[in-house]
Amino acid sequence: PERKIVRVPDKLKQDIKVVTHSLMNQVASNPKILHEITPRQFEELVCELFEKEGNHVELTKQTRDGGKDLIILNNSSLGDFVIYAECKKRAPKYPVNVGFVRELYGTVNADNATAGIMVTTSYFSRDARKYQEKIKSRMSLIDYSELMKRIMACK
């Protein structure tokens, strides 16, 4: 199939950022909202958070995203880094298991990205944390608690 590049007008980009920023403020004042938004809204929220932290972030398409929801371009005095992020919106009592972390790490390696970040509205299983510990220079895990700290710091 032929691929087409769609240019999003700057005004529309700004409108999207305003809505997402408003959502970030709502989550900061009422964290329960985080569990009521759609998975795509969660991805957009995390995208906005990483942008506010000083990164350039690309949100991938909703389906067949190649195992990554966000592509984070981090430019610093140490170099240029490409970081893949996967967002897992889960109910508070359902952990993200090791399989998801392995899958993201496989995508990071296959695409020769610098590192990966898994972000969730829940928490990570013991096995997921154990696995991440082995690859900690190339994989970060952000659970609900850490995510809320970061949202509060950026509001």
Segments the model singles out, each with a brief description of its role:
Residues 1-155:
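Mixed-charge (Asp/Glu-Lys/Arg
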